[in-house]
Amino acid sequence: MDDQPRLMHSHPGVGMAGHPSLSQHMQDGTGANEGEGGRKQDIGDILQQIMTITDQSLDEAQARKHALNCHRMKPALFNVLCEIKEKTVLSIRGAQEEEPADPQLMRLDNMLLAEGVAGPEKGGGSAAAAAAAAASGGAGADNSAEHSDYRAKLSQIRQIYHTELEKYEQACNEFTTHVMNLLREQSRTRPISPKEIERMVSIIHRKFSSIQMQLKQSTCEAVMILRSRFLDARRKRRNFNKQATEILNEYFYSHLSNPYPSEEAKEELAKKCAITVSQVSNWFGNKRIRYKKNIGKFQEEANIYAAKTAVNATNVSVHGSQANSPSTPSSAGGYPSPCYQSDRRIQ
């Protein structure tokens, strides 16, 4: 018994530290610390690799992708990602709904169709001509040149619209195809369903629809400006026929000292010219302004109408004197003799 303490003191390296279970526990603690440090280092390496992905060349990226697809743990990683995705999708699945069509875009489409700009026919053919004829309210031969100009400019707007629309559709299709190919490629590594690809395509189309709306809006504005310039303005400044212009000018220059016709005179002139009273008033207002601005230019015209008025007055006086002159004696017996009554009055 006395030898045991002596043995323990004679071997200081053996004791509590020499207990096999305690020694194993201490070794496990050291291993755990080393394992935790190793995991931190692995995570740091992964993050560093992620940060340098954008700096990799295409060949390096393809090599990394091939190595990942051939890795023996790839199926396990994909299954874990599917489980995580399923939990996440369940919470947002009900929020995905199709949005209704934009009413503003529908209005623009209807307007472009009505104006003959949109539609299957390109080049401003019969549709544009029909729109021009309908907007003009019926054109005569006098306005054929103006309407031809309108149709030509409408055809130009139509051509620009379809050219820009083709560019828009081409860019949208190219970007959509690129995104779809990218998602299909990524679906080999992370779970992506076909419905999610369709949803992404619809999101892209909504983003591009804003560009389409701007194009259609600017086209509609161009058509409206063209319409007001060549059609509405033409109605306002429509020239009267030659006979109406002659009647109005004759009255104006015959009343040059006071070229302000009364309401009765306006109504009479409107009947003679087959126009409205307001058109007569507008014509006299514009005529007075033009005459005051350039009296010398209109003086010759005033002289012409003054001479014409004098000739007309002379003709009227001549015809009047002939109508009032006594009749010539007839061959039967000349003037009839007056009959005297008893009261000496001539019958």
Swiss-Prot record:
<dbReference type="InterPro" id="IPR008422">
    <property type="entry name" value="KN_HD"/>
</dbReference>
<dbReference type="GO" id="GO:0007399">
    <property type="term" value="P:nervous system development"/>
</dbReference>
<feature type="region of interest" description="PBC-A">
    <location>
        <begin position="45"/>
        <end position="124"/>
    </location>
</feature>
<dbReference type="GO" id="GO:0000981">
    <property type="term" value="F:DNA-binding transcription factor activity, RNA polymerase II-specific"/>
</dbReference>
<feature type="domain" description="PBC">
    <location>
        <begin position="38"/>
        <end position="232"/>
    </location>
</feature>
<keyword id="KW-0524">Neurogenesis</keyword>
<keyword id="KW-0221">Differentiation</keyword>
<feature type="region of interest" description="Disordered">
    <location>
        <begin position="318"/>
        <end position="347"/>
    </location>
</feature>
<feature type="DNA-binding region" description="Homeobox; TALE-type">
    <location>
        <begin position="233"/>
        <end position="295"/>
    </location>
</feature>
<comment type="function">
    <text>Acts as a transcriptional activator in complex with isoform 2 of meis1, to induce posterior neural and neural crest gene expression, and thereby specify hindbrain and neural crest cell fate. Binds to a highly conserved region in the promoter of the neural crest gene zic3. Required for the nuclear transport or retention of meis1.</text>
</comment>
<feature type="compositionally biased region" description="Polar residues">
    <location>
        <begin position="318"/>
        <end position="331"/>
    </location>
</feature>
<keyword id="KW-0371">Homeobox</keyword>
<dbReference type="InterPro" id="IPR050224">
    <property type="entry name" value="TALE_homeobox"/>
</dbReference>
<feature type="region of interest" description="PBC-B">
    <location>
        <begin position="127"/>
        <end position="232"/>
    </location>
</feature>
<dbReference type="InterPro" id="IPR017970">
    <property type="entry name" value="Homeobox_CS"/>
</dbReference>
<dbReference type="GO" id="GO:0005634">
    <property type="term" value="C:nucleus"/>
</dbReference>
<keyword id="KW-0539">Nucleus</keyword>
<dbReference type="InterPro" id="IPR005542">
    <property type="entry name" value="PBX_PBC_dom"/>
</dbReference>
<dbReference type="GO" id="GO:0005667">
    <property type="term" value="C:transcription regulator complex"/>
</dbReference>
<dbReference type="GO" id="GO:0045944">
    <property type="term" value="P:positive regulation of transcription by RNA polymerase II"/>
</dbReference>
<dbReference type="GO" id="GO:0043565">
    <property type="term" value="F:sequence-specific DNA binding"/>
</dbReference>
<comment type="subunit">
    <text>Forms a heterodimer with meis1; the interaction is necessary for neural fate induction.</text>
</comment>
<comment type="similarity">
    <text>Belongs to the TALE/PBX homeobox family.</text>
</comment>
<keyword id="KW-0238">DNA-binding</keyword>
<keyword id="KW-0010">Activator</keyword>
<protein>
    <recommendedName>
        <fullName>Pre-B-cell leukemia transcription factor 1</fullName>
    </recommendedName>
</protein>
<dbReference type="GO" id="GO:0045893">
    <property type="term" value="P:positive regulation of DNA-templated transcription"/>
</dbReference>
<feature type="region of interest" description="Disordered">
    <location>
        <begin position="1"/>
        <end position="40"/>
    </location>
</feature>
<dbReference type="InterPro" id="IPR009057">
    <property type="entry name" value="Homeodomain-like_sf"/>
</dbReference>
<keyword id="KW-0217">Developmental protein</keyword>
<dbReference type="GO" id="GO:0014036">
    <property type="term" value="P:neural crest cell fate specification"/>
</dbReference>
<dbReference type="Pfam" id="PF03792">
    <property type="entry name" value="PBC"/>
</dbReference>
<keyword id="KW-0805">Transcription regulation</keyword>
<dbReference type="InterPro" id="IPR001356">
    <property type="entry name" value="HD"/>
</dbReference>
<dbReference type="Pfam" id="PF05920">
    <property type="entry name" value="Homeobox_KN"/>
</dbReference>
<keyword id="KW-0804">Transcription</keyword>
